[in-house]
């Protein structure tokens, strides 16, 4: 939360807040005086209104049913109108992913980093907030998950990382990543 407040003090706008929920978080231990840390914030910050929003859609639970809507006319009388519901709806702002070996990535080298991001989380965020050919910037590249998914989704990537060890992990992951023959559209 402090990061969002800091960037807002620099003139960025907080456009959206989402939650990354870990289905199988690392246990805190019996002697710990706090609950298991099972979620993290995802902040979408921008200088202006975001130019891109490609929401992840899911089939609406009751999309096949009509809805009765009340509407009060100018004369004060209540009118009931049957309307068609949308067949699809945007997903909730809580994104749940399993983490750890066999879940976050199949790249064994990535686990040399202590806190890797699930590839599906990176894929979902990149697909939502960018278009094909856009540039993705990750100021904390870590094990290179954002870099890998950006390139597989046909985005350009720029990143920074202080640790030369983590830069080497990223380099190896990108060298091993399959080349996208067919690019996904949004």
Regions found by a protein language model. Give the residues of each.
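Core catalytic lobe of class I
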Residues: 1-177
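Positively charged, low-complexity nucleic-acid-binding target-recognition regions
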Residues: 175-186
């Amino acid at each position: 939360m402090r990061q969002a407040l800091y960037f807002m003090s620099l003139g960025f706008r907080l456009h959206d807040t989402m939650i990354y929920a870990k289905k199988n978080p690392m246990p805190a231990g019996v002697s710990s005086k706090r609950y298991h840390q099972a979620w993290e914030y995802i902040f979408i910050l921008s200088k202006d209104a975001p130019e891109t929003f490609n929401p992840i859609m899911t089939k609406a639970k009751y999309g096949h049913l009509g809805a009765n809507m009340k509407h009060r006319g100018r004369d004060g009388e209540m009118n009931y109108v049957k309307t068609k519901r949308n067949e699809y709806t945007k997903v909730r702002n809580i994104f749940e992913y399993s983490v750890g070996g066999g879940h976050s990535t199949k790249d064994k080298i990535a686990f040399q980093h202590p806190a890797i991001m699930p590839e599906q989380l990176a894929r979902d965020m990149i697909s939502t907030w960018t278009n094909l050919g856009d540039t993705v910037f990750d100021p904390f590249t870590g094990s290179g998950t954002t870099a890998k998914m950006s390139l597989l989704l046909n985005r350009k990537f720029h990143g920074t990382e202080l640790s030369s060890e983590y830069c080497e992990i990223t380099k190896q992951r990108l060298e091993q990543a399959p080349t996208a023959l067919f690019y996904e559209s949004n």
